[in-house]
C-alpha cells in the first residue's frame, strides 16, 4: 500500500471518528459545535488533498480507460451532490445553530459521507493502486 493511500485512509478514519463523536454528543452543546467545526475543516482539507494528489492520477489514467472514465464521472457527480448538501448544512448551522432540524440533517449528511468513504475505499482506492503500480 502506497504512503499516499495510507495517509488517505488515515484521513478517512479521522473524518469517520469525528462524525461518530458528533453523533454521540449533543450537537447543540459547545463540544458538539466545536466538533462540527473540526469536521468542516477536516472535510475541506481532505477534499483539497484528493483534488491535488488523488484524482489527477486517476483522471490521467481515465484518458485511455473508458471504464475508469465512466466510474470517475459517476463519482464526480456524486461528490458534487454531497459537497453541495454538506455546504448547505454548514451554512444552516452558521445561520441557525439551534435549528430543530439540525440533528436529523446531520444524520443524513453523515450517512452520505460514510457511504462515499466506503465506496471510495472499495472502488477508487483499488483503481488508484492499480494505476500507480503500473508506473
Task: Give short role names for the model-derived ranges.
Residues 1-135:
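Small-residue-biased structural context
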Amino acid at each position: 500500500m502506497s504512503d499516499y493511500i495510507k495517509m488517505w485512509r488515515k484521513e478517512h478514519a479521522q473524518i469517520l471518528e469525528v462524525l461518530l463523536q458528533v453523533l454521540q454528543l449533543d450537537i447543540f452543546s459547545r463540544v458538539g459545535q466545536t466538533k462540527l467545526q473540526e469536521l468542516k475543516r477536516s472535510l475541506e482539507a481532505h477534499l483539497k488533498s484528493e483534488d491535488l494528489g488523488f484524482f489527477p492520477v486517476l483522471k490521467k489514467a481515465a484518458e485511455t480507460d473508458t471504464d475508469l472514465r465512466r466510474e470517475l464521472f459517476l463519482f464526480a457527480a456524486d461528490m458534487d451532490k454531497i459537497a453541495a448538501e454538506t455546504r448547505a448544512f454548514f451554512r444552516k448551522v452558521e445561520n441557525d445553530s439551534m435549528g430543530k432540524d439540525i440533528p436529523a440533517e446531520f444524520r443524513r449528511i453523515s450517512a452520505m459521507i460514510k457511504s462515499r468513504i466506503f465506496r471510495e475505499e472499495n472502488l477508487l482506492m483499488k483503481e488508484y493502486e492499480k494505476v500507480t503500480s503500473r508506473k
